[in-house]
Amino acid sequence: MFQVLVVEDDQELNRTVCAYLNQNGYQALGCLDANVAYDAMYGGTLFDLIISDIMMPGVDGFAFARTVRELNQEIPILFMTARDDFASKQRGFQAGIDDYMVKPIDLDELLLRMEALLRRARIASSKKLTTVTKPAIITI
């Protein structure tokens, strides 16, 4: 079962997204801000995907994404935000996110995007495992 971290300061949306993901075979944990999300990440759970808002109290989504990228280059990050301007999208992708959805979101579309991100992450991971070089045969 895939572990998903949902970082969204709107409590109702956070609960709705987590409930929907849990009903669809994911294990979702909701956090209301980035600091709580950091605690969850350091708490030992290995998350497979992060969904984050941009506009949150304290640490915003851009700073959160940059910090996550510094710690883990491979975990997919999807922004789910009300910001629909190009500058925000650009900043998000430059911070290291993998996808961007504008609120209000369609939960079925969110699921499709998550599945695509997880599929690409699995492919990238399997390529790393299969590109191990064959050791040379040494004759003595």
Where are these regions (language model features)?
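The feature encodes the CheY-like receiver
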Residues: 57, 85, 103
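Short, Lys/Arg-enriched segments at the junction into DNA-binding effector domains
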Residues: 3, 116-140
